[in-house]
Amino acid sequence: MLETGRKMKALGLLSGGLDSTLAVKLMLERGIEVEALNFVTPFCLCRKGGCGAAEAAKTFNIPLKMVSAGTDYLRIIRKPKYGYGKNMNPCVDCRIFMLKKAKKHAQLIKAEFIFTGEVLGQRPMSQHRGALDLIERKAGLKERLFALYPVDFCQKLRQKRKGSWTNRSYWTLLGAREKDNLS
């Protein structure tokens, strides 16, 4: 709850995959009002008749705005400043692009921060501490971007910070080991 008496509000980047869906659930469990943003790219793998992001938004009863990534996105993937990840995906450049757009939307809806389903250590190119810091800085979201962190990192951080929230929220999720997250 904010000093004004209203609930804290956050904008979540929701792909509809497990990690972003869990991130939404975690925010809602903490009493944070959530609105979601989903980027539709030419490479979107949504099933006919349904999209994972739309299904998750409906399940959690949260507003979802679908945004076409557009031609700017295509320019970025043709010549990414930070290079390609596995399978030719320009991970870092895509995250910066999407988060810059998300920042504008967050301002419109008066969200205090933005969160993603990024999990520290899950992807070697874009989901390590250095890359997440770069993405946060280049997107202009210093201290306004929250991501998910694995158990061992959380435990070390809690010891260091005595369990308090600082610039980010640190949750216990295990990254690529999705079976553990589902139990």
Regions found by a protein language model. Name each.
Residues 1-183:
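ATP-dependent adenylation/nucleotidyltransferase module used to activate substrates
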